[in-house]
Amino acid sequence: KLPSLRRAINEPGRKLLLATKTWEPLKYSDTKSTNGKLTTYPSGEVHASGTFPANTRYDLTAASQDFTAFRVTIIPETENIAALPERGSVLSTLSLHKIKADGAKEKINLSYVFADQVAGTFDPVGSIGNGHDGFGGYPKLFGKRQAVFIPAAPVTFAKDEKLEITMQHRSSTTGGQACTVRRFTIDTSNNTAWTQLLSNPDHAKNVATHNQALNQYNQIKGTNIPVIRERSEHATRETRIFLGGLWLNKGEVQQPGVPKLLNGYQNKVDTRLEMAHWITSPENPLTARVMANRLSSDMFGRGIVETLGD
């Protein structure tokens, strides 16, 4: 129930993210990092280089531009799609401040986060809090990720004011390998539809229902165990042939289905569950042949086909 509720809350924002075509990239006047180095490019991209331990923080200063939505795009380091996935990349906490002309800072309150997809162990909404969640790809980054941060009210700037962006990283994988954001863009939109999204009664209702269900879940005592669950259609991952069985050497992209050699009638099979039903069907001779070969091996010491895995 919780995953479906979370996706229902995110869906209007996901659709608006796809529909919003006009975004204005930030123009940086200063970029700092507690570790390593940040480099900006005319395209608006920011690249991180060097050594980045956990808890690395980025502090960026940009020229002011009014906005109703603040988009962060995490981009894989590699240009070769077949080489993905790569090391995880997670924005743990994002905070924004106005820098007044006299140097004083005013916090910009962020109300919600909508993402291109909601899947995995981290909730993107956690990136505007102080928890251990965040937005990005964890423990691996499988492709470009996008999230839109919505302020509590449209943000406007006076003359000579600037925008300060703080990006905090806390996530790490086994061995203490930090999952910092290493290549990204930040841009803004002044589309009022983003503000209207938060004022929609359905949004508030769905958030309240989700929070109530989450509180009930957290009150259940017991041991957490992993559960396999099919990813939503917007969060599916690319599947490729491993050439020679080597995962580092990838071939063509593959679509869900049954190998033609085993599916003479070319029945449409789109999911693993359907394939399991197909394999175990009483009408499928493959299952009987495998079983007969296993029984032969157990009873006579050798199967009809000696290598049982073939």
Residue spans of the language-model regions?
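Extracellular beta-rich ligand/substrate-recognition surface
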Residues: 46-55, 135-145, 264-269
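Short, surface-exposed tryptophan/glycine-enriched loops
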Residues: 59-62, 121-160
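Extended low-complexity, serine/threonine- and proline-enriched intrinsically disordered segments
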Residues: 87-119, 126, 184-188
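Extracellular polysaccharide-targeting segments
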Residues: 187-212
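Short coil-to-beta strand junction motifs in C2/discoidin
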Residues: 65-67, 78-93, 176-184
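Extended extracellular/luminal ectodomain segments enriched in beta-structured repeat modules
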Residues: 55, 64-71, 157-164
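Short beta-strand-plus-loop segments that form exposed binding edges in beta-rich domains
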Residues: 74-78, 166-178
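Short, functional "switch" segments adjacent to catalytic/cofactor/reactive centers
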Residues: 1-44, 49, 115-116, 120-130, ...
